[in-house]
């Protein structure tokens, strides 16, 4: 409890401390880590094939008084039909590569690293890629002043085939007598259905709908360590991050049974801003033999904001063009949110007493004020 108290009320669920990889004194080191592999579904759920479904249909049709379907008179002359799970899921390739270059001398250390992850989704049409870069640098300007900078940048892209499990549910519920594609290449959908239940083609859902994100993240931190006198260390930090989040969604015109869906495109852009300015001083001293004291006092200011903008249009003449400008301007809807700026200012302190390297006493204080 004492260890987390220094971080205030927001540490009620615990604190995760992240340390960055730094260069070591000596010659430059080049390190590479990577792998390639494949992913696949470990198991498929048991569902009815076409002969089993036809037999079930005939029993229910007899009870409901529908009459048998001509093509279901002898179910076991039928093929197995469509196994939608095996149509929807695939063996997916993935690769991950990371390179790090680090080094330094007694007064300077550096570390540069880059990574790339490319992961095809087990579900067709889905996937994830991430490119990242990180740089850490610190130097001793004098024997009492050290400065440094840490930066990290990443770009992630994701194709989202499965939203709220709709495609998976459709694959489990869709009838095995529906073909994934018709002979002319179009997607198969049920046009007549005595159950009065219609499911879209999950292969169509995965391939034709656009649902993707493209996000950028930048984190930065600059710091200075000042040692004006023996035992006293003053650290000043300024840092923050910027996040750019872009969403793209498009649904083409399609219909099945009595259901008709109009084409629609939606675009969204979001920006997050976070800043932090922290200063704290730590003083270590030994007033008596086997007695060690440490006193730390600090101040931190944090502030940020969130902005968002989105737009949508319907009535596209072509499914090949997803730009908002290509939609019917009469159906345009827009929304924006400049967000609510927020800020937190904090003062904190900690006292540590060590007797004989055996008995420890710690006291922590912190106060926060927020906008």
Language-model features: where?
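A generic beta-sheet turn/junction motif
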Residues: 11, 103-107, 116, 355, ...
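Surface-exposed loop/interface segments of Gram-negative outer-membrane beta-barrel transport/assembly proteins
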Residues: 24-81, 121-128, 132-217, 235-345
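Membrane-embedded beta-strands of outer-membrane beta-barrel proteins
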Residues: 16, 99, 133-135, 220-222, ...
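Outer-membrane beta-barrel initiation region
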Residues: 44, 87-91, 101-105
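Outer-membrane beta-barrel channels and translocator barrels
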Residues: 25, 94, 105-106, 142, ...
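Repeated loop/turn-to-beta-strand initiation elements of outer-membrane beta-barrel proteins
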Residues: 107-110, 144-147, 231-234, 291, ...
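Transmembrane beta-strand segments that form the barrel wall of outer-membrane beta-barrel proteins
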Residues: 34, 114-120, 361-369
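A beta-strand signature from Gram-negative outer-membrane beta-barrel systems
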Residues: 1-31, 94-96, 109, 115-117
């Amino acid at each position: 409890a004492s260890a987390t108290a220094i971080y205030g009320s927001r540490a009620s669920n615990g604190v995760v401390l992240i340390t960055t990889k730094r260069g070591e004194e000596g010659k430059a080191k080049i390190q590479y880590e990577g792998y390639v592999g494949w992913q696949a579904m470990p198991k498929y759920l048991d569902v009815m094939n076409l002969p089993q479904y036809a037999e079930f249909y005939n029993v229910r049709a007899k009870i409901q008084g529908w009459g048998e379907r001509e093509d279901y008179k002898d179910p076991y002359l039928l093929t197995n039909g469509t196994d939608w799970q095996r149509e929807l899921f695939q063996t997916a390739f993935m690769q991950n590569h990371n390179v790090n270059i680090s080094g330094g001398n007694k007064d300077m250390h550096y570390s540069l690293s880059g990574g790339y992850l490319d992961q095809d989704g087990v579900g067709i049409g889905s996937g994830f890629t991430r490119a990242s870069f990180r740089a850490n640098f610190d130097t001793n300007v004098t024997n009492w002043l050290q400065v440094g900078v840490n930066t990290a940048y990443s770009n992630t892209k994701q194709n989202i085939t499965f939203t709220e499990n709709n495609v998976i549910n459709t694959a489990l519920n869709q009838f095995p007598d529906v073909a994934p594609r018709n002979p002319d290449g179009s997607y198969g959908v049920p046009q007549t259905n005595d159950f009065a239940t219609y499911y879209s083609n999950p292969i169509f859902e995965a391939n034709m709908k656009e649902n993707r994100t493209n996000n950028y993240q930048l984190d930065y931190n600059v710091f200075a360590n000042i040692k004006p006198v023996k035992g006293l260390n003053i650290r000043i930090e300024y840092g923050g991050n910027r996040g750019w989040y872009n969403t793209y969604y498009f649904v083409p015109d399609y219909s099945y049974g009595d259901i008709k869906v109009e084409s629609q495109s939606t675009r969204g852009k979001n920006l997050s801003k976070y800043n932090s300015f922290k200063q704290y001083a730590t003083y270590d001293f030994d007033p008596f033999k086997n007695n060690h004291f440490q006193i730390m006092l600090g101040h931190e200011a944090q502030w940020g904001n969130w902005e968002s903008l989105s737009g949508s249009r319907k009535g596209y003449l072509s499914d090949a063009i997803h730009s908002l400008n290509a939609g019917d301007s009469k159906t345009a809807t827009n929304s924006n949110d400049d967000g609510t700026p927020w800020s937190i200012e904090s003062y904190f302190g900690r006292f540590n007493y060590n007797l004989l390297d055996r008995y420890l006493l710690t006291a922590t204080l912190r106060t926060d004020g927020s906008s």
